[in-house]
Design a protein with these regions (language model features):
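Gly/Ser/Thr/Ala-enriched C-terminal appendages of enzymes
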Residues: 2-138
Length: 138
C-alpha cells in the first residue's frame, strides 16, 4: 500500500499507514498475510493492541498476536487500555461513530490521548517512536 494512505482522488493523505494482516480466501476463511521485505517484516494475522501506563503516562504499546481462540481468551494486565475500536462490524457502521457528537467525542479523545503521552512525544521527528512497542506471539 505504501507509506501513506490516500483518501480519494486529488485528496491529501490521511497521515497514517495501512498494514494488511489477513485476507479472506476463496473458501471464505481468513488467511494471515505478512510483509517479508528486509527490515519491514510483519507478524501476520489478527492482533490485539493495548497501551500500558506509569504515573498516568503511556509507557508501552503492547501488540498481541495469536489464533482466534488464543486472542478471545487473552486477558491483558490490569490497567492496560484496549486500543482497538469497532467502527464497522459485518458491514454495519457503529452509530456511535457517526454524526456531530461523534466528531466532538473524537476531538476530545485525541486531546486526552495526547495528554497521556510523554512530553517528548510532541517534539519528535517523523518516524521516531513515541514509546516502545512490545510484540507478543501467543
Amino acid at each position: 500500500v505504501g507509506t501513506m494512505l490516500v483518501t480519494g482522488s486529488g485528496a491529501p493523505t490521511c497521515a497514517m499507514v495501512y498494514k494488511l494482516t489477513e485476507r479472506e480466501n476463496s473458501a471464505g476463511d481468513m488467511q494471515p498475510v505478512a510483509k517479508k521485505s528486509k527490515d519491514k517484516a510483519t507478524v501476520p494475522g489478527r492482533k490485539l493492541a493495548f497501551r500500558s501506563y506509569e504515573y498516568a503516562l503511556a509507557d508501552c504499546e503492547h501488540v498481541i498476536s495469536g489464533s482466534e481462540e488464543q486472542l478471545a481468551a487473552y486477558q491483558p494486565e490490569e490497567g492496560w487500555k484496549d486500543l482497538l475500536v469497532g467502527y464497522v462490524s459485518n458491514g454495519e457502521i457503529n452509530s456511535d461513530y457517526q454524526g456531530h457528537e461523534a466528531i466532538v467525542n473524537a476531538h476530545n479523545y485525541r486531546a486526552q490521548a495526547l495528554a497521556e503521552l510523554p512530553i517528548g512525544a510532541q517534539s519528535l521527528m517523523k518516524g521516531d517512536p513515541v514509546i516502545p512497542t512490545e510484540i507478543t506471539v501467543l
